[in-house]
């Protein structure tokens, strides 16, 4: 009996640190389970909507301690796609993303605030067009669990808005078109 109790205690003590630590995930972009879309007002009458087709990233997350989460994302800005070839060419130009000089945008989290019920604020630094500025993403933990293929997944949504001029984008599209709204869908596969 003592031997069984000792074995159980040793086993529990070995598993306890694993249960309390954050898991690392890679963003499942290839399975089309993640997206980065944007929306910009078009003259105050409508919206131009687009996406970035090529990005990668990873995150660590523990539902028991969400404030310890970390996020890193790299976006290939050349992959911008607004479903209009001429407009995409203009977005890639020095008027906007200047992709010939800055082919990548990055986001690296610095802190995470737990707002309760799966709601988070992910604070970090966005580097876009060669400029790095703080950015807060309002996020929500959608869920996590086993997938049918023997893996483990965690999913989140997020939104944020930023002023183009803050990132050195000086093209004046009028006051109704000065901000970009980002919508994020992230599903990660545990490493």
Swiss-Prot record:
Signal peptide: 1-22
Keyword Oxidoreductase carried by entry: no
Main subcellular location: periplasm
Any one of the GO CC terms: periplasmic space
Compartment annotation: Periplasm
UniProt-listed InterPro entries: Lipid/polyisoprenoid-bd_YceI (IPR007372), TTHA0802/YceI-like_sf (IPR036761), UPF0312/YceI (IPR023480)
Origin superkingdom: Bacteria
Keywords, in A-Z order: Periplasm, Signal
Keyword Signal belongs to the record: yes
Family annotation (PANTHER family): PROTEIN YCEI (PTHR34406:SF1)
Family, per entry: Belongs to the UPF0312 family. Type 1 subfamily.
Protein name (record): UPF0312 protein Shew185_3055
Source organism of this protein record: Shewanella baltica (strain OS185)
């Amino acid at each position: 009996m003592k031997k069984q109790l000792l074995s159980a205690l040793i086993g529990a003590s070995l598993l306890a640190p694993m249960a309390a630590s954050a898991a690392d995930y890679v963003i499942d972009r290839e399975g089309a389970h993640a997206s980065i879309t944007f929306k910009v007002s078009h003259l105050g009458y409508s919206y131009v909507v687009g996406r970035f087709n090529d990005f990668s990233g990873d995150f660590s997350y523990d539902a028991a301690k969400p404030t310890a989460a970390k996020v890193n994302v790299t976006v290939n800005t050349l992959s911008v796609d607004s479903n209009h070839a001429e407009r995409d060419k203009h977005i890639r130009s020095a008027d906007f993303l200047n992709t010939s000089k800055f082919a990548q945008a990055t986001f690296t989290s610095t802190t995470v605030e737990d707002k309760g019920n799966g709601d988070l604020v992910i604070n970090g630094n966005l580097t876009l067009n060669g400029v790095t500025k703080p950015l807060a993403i309002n996020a929500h933990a959608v869920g996590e669990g086993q997938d049918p293929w023997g893996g483990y997944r965690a999913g989140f949504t997020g939104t944020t808005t930023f002023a183009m001029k803050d990132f050195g984008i000086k093209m004046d599209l009028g006051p109704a078109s000065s901000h970009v709204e980002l919508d994020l869908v992230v599903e990660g596969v545990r490493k």
